[in-house]
Swiss-Prot record:
Natural source organism: Bacillus subtilis (strain 168)
Entry keywords, A to Z: Antibiotic resistance, Ribonucleoprotein, Ribosomal protein, RNA-binding, rRNA-binding, tRNA-binding
Protein name per UniProt: Small ribosomal subunit protein uS12
Miscellaneous: Many streptomycin resistant B.subtilis with mutations in this protein produce increased quantities of a natural (but uncharacterized) antibiotic.
Result of changing K56I: In RPSL4; STRA1, confers streptomycin resistance and hyperaccurate translation, has no effect on natural antibiotic production
Self-association and partners: Part of the 30S ribosomal subunit. Contacts proteins S8 and S17. May interact with IF1 in the 30S initiation complex. Interacts with BrxC.
Gene Ontology MF annotations: rRNA binding; structural constituent of ribosome; tRNA binding
Chain's gene name: rpsL
């Protein structure tokens, strides 16, 4: 416990909170060729690698992921949600924040139904999260 004198001399230092999705907090000015501290809710990027990885214990699956080079020059690993996807190398995708708990190092999600990413086929519920259009009434 500090004394009053110690508090007067030093004061309390507030903790710095680290971002959970740091790649979204950096921008890039291509004219000046310099990084800027402009945050954005989503970012566009190009897939450099698409593959599957296995989750941590106790889960077992083949989770789909893509390595994405963003417009600010940072390369991140992003999860591809939903069943089936049409992504391959050089696909242009939109990423948002949000980690995948059982995949270490995956801090971003790819937005389905935006840019080159198709929505999930034959999805009836939770369609807005997977970029699926409303089915035609018969």
């Amino acid at each position: 416990m500090p004394t009053i004198n110690q508090l007067i001399r030093k004061g309390r230092v507030s903790k710095v909170e680290n971002s959970k999705s740091p790649a979204l907090n950096k921008g890039y000015n291509s004219f000046k060729k310099e990084h800027t501290n402009v945050s954005s809710p989503q970012k566009r990027g190009v897939c450099t690698r698409v593959g599957t990885m296995t989750p941590k214990k106790p889960n077992s699956a083949l989770r789909k992921y893509a390595r994405v080079r963003l417009t600010n020059g940072i390369e991140v690993t992003a999860y591809i949600p939903g069943i089936g996807h049409n992504l391959q190398e050089h696909s242009v995708v939109l990423i948002r924040g949000g980690r995948v708990k059982d995949l270490p190092g995956v801090r971003y999600h790819i937005v389905r139904g935006a840019l080159d990413t198709a929505g999930v086929e034959n999805r009836a519920q939770g369609r807005s999260k997977y970029g699926t259009k409303k089915p035609k009434a018969k």
